[in-house]
Amino acid sequence: MSKVAIVGDFHLGVAPNNSLKFETLFESQQRFFTECLIPVLKARKIDTIIFTGDLYDQRRRIDSKIAQYVEGLFQNELKDFKCIVLQGNHDTYYKDDLTVTSLSNIWSKPNVTAITKITPMELFGVKFLFVPWLTSSMSEKFIENVDKVAGRFQYVVGHFETMGFPFEAGSICTNGMNPEILYNNFKNTISGHFHTQSFKEVNGNSIHYVGTPFQLT
């Protein structure tokens, strides 16, 4: 029986302007993969990993050491896993256009599926809808057409900015998408983007922000 792991924003390459912090966090992130995540996935016989966006931290300038590490990570340590990687806003060069993305250095890997547009997919008999970071025009189209796909998917996995959810401890998002759009059309919504884990349920339909897997500050 196949199993899926869902992991939140990694922000590899965070704090580029502080060399000590950059190196400390990068070493910690590497240890998380080699000493925690990968051993746990193998022990639990998980074969598919869904990354909910923001694999990288810097939108416009990727440190060459980070780029080389990420390429090697998916080519070597993660080669036995099917990896579904959503494009987050930090993986996107332009603020409101997804065409240029830092994920381009891994999407040719045979084990990687990069989600750069809204993509339906069936995994192990379960219907998923994958939603990358939504530009303003994409968000408008998503909202206009969401009722056409309502009830068709067991899980929606995205990189949503949703009002009323904490993006950090003690800070609530006051902008973005009205959560009713997700509650009214999907049974289970799972999202990256916000760094604090949270869960809310309305009339049996839920939104779950998975949060970051480690401290980023």
Locate predicted features.
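Hydrophobic/aromatic residues located in beta-strands of well-ordered beta-sheets
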Residues: 49, 83-85, 128, 154, ...
